[in-house]
């Protein structure tokens, strides 16, 4: 009935084919999770050795949406490794309509922070900054837990202010990135505003190597 937006979330794997199929379902947006995404509940082999990098996933997803004629009708949301405004701006330039943020917001909440109330070695068997035990429900800073005593370690008002400051700063950084590219709106960013520093990045993102007009994998190569 058009009252509730429907979003499909996909892990970045066979991105182009998956997004093409998803786009035909009539959903409102497609959420792509790149391999850079952080989670404390997944095994190391899954979080570090599987998935498709964001710069490749975004371009493939955008091409898929465009190719099925759903441009402007289905929004592309990207998540995975968004840590600062530069990450946001680059994702938008590559074709994302929006980004989603998870792990970095947890950091702003106090995740993994060495606070006086938390004894990481005694409580978790690890040092502060190396916790990653969200799934156990024993979060020493009170973020990922339902334990009443542990929850007291998190001040909701202070935590909300930290998250606000993080998101506000991230927004300002993204705007500065757009201005540096001569754009008045971050959504005006496009691939031509980017340059790749490695051959791999050029091939995956479909943008020229810095200082050249050459995009790896594209035959028409012209020297500046």
Task: Locate predicted features.
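Glycine-rich phosphate/ribose-binding loops and adjacent secondary-structure elements
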Residues: 1-151
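C-terminal extensions of enzymes
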Residues: 147-224
């Amino acid at each position: 009935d058009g009252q509730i937006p429907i979003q499909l979330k996909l892990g970045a794997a066979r991105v182009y084919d998956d997004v093409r199929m998803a786009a035909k379902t009539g959903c409102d947006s497609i959420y792509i999770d790149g391999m850079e995404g952080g989670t404390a509940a997944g095994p190391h082999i899954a979080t570090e050795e599987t998935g498709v990098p964001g710069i490749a996933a975004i371009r493939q997803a955008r091409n898929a949406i465009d190719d099925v004629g759903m441009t402007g009708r289905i929004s592309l949301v990207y998540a995975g490794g968004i840590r600062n405004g530069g990450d946001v701006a680059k994702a938008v330039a590559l074709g994302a309509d929006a980004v989603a943020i998870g792990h970095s917001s947890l950091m702003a909440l106090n995740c993994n922070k060495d606070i006086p109330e938390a004894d990481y070695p005694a409580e978790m068997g690890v040092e502060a900054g190396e916790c990653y035990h969200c799934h156990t429900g024993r979060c020493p800073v009170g973020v990922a837990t339902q334990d009443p005593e542990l929850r007291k370690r998190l001040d909701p008002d202070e935590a909300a202010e930290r998250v606000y400051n993080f998101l506000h700063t991230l927004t300002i950084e993204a705007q500065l990135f757009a201005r540096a590219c001569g754009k008045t709106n971050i959504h005006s960013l496009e691939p031509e505003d980017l340059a790749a520093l490695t051959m791999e990045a050029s091939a995956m993102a479909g943008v020229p190597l810095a200082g050249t007009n050459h995009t790896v994998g594209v035959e028409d190569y012209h020297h500046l």
